[in-house]
Structures are given as C-alpha cells and as structure tokens.
C-alpha cells in the first residue's frame, strides 16, 4: 500500500514536503474526525448497529492515504512499524494478558 501511495503521488507530481509535519498530523486528526462522524451517522448516534457505508470506507481510505503519505515523506517503513507494534501487543498479551499500555 505504501508504494501505491508513493507511485500515485509521484506520478501526479503531488508535493507533500512543503507542508510541515505538524500540519500533516493535524490533517490526519481532521480525517479521524470525519471517520468518527460517518460512524455516528451510520449508527444514528449509537441508536442502531453499525452498517458499513461507502462514505465510511472513503473516510477510512483518506486516513490510510494521509498516514502512508506521511510515512513516505519521513522515510518510515509502515509495514515495519506495523510488525513492531504487533510484536509489542503480543508481548503485552503474553506478559499481562492485556494489550493496553500501563501508562
């Protein structure tokens, strides 16, 4: 997925570097809010079960795109990060039977 985003951005000459990292992080936070809004709409603010909608999928995709664009911009290997966090969660489950942090 990360390479797909990189190829798309490069082929369309989408320049992300001029945007400061903090702006990119705020954009990701904004996308999270839009995803939450689609969840609320789908559940009628918690009064019914969640139904996956096209709008929810699009907002989820926006978050993935934004995260992977940030990873490319910062030369972060997203798959390696995922492997590290899965190992962290496995270790927590093995040691304390809970994935949550102790902070």
Residue ranges and their predicted role:
Residues 1-60, 64-103:
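Flexible "arm" and connector segments at domain edges
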């Amino acid at each position: 997925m990360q390479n797909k985003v990189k190829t798309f951005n490069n082929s369309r000459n989408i320049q992300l570097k001029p945007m400061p990292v903090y702006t990119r992080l705020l954009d990701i936070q904004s996308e999270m809010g839009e995803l939450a809004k689609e969840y609320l709409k789908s559940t009628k603010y918690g009064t019914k079960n969640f139904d996956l909608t096209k709008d929810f999928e699009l907002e989820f995709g926006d978050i993935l795109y934004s995260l992977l664009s940030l990873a490319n911009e910062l030369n972060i290997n997203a798959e390696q990060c995922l492997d590290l966090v899965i190992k962290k969660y496995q270790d927590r489950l093995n040691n304390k039977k809970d994935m949550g942090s102790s902070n």
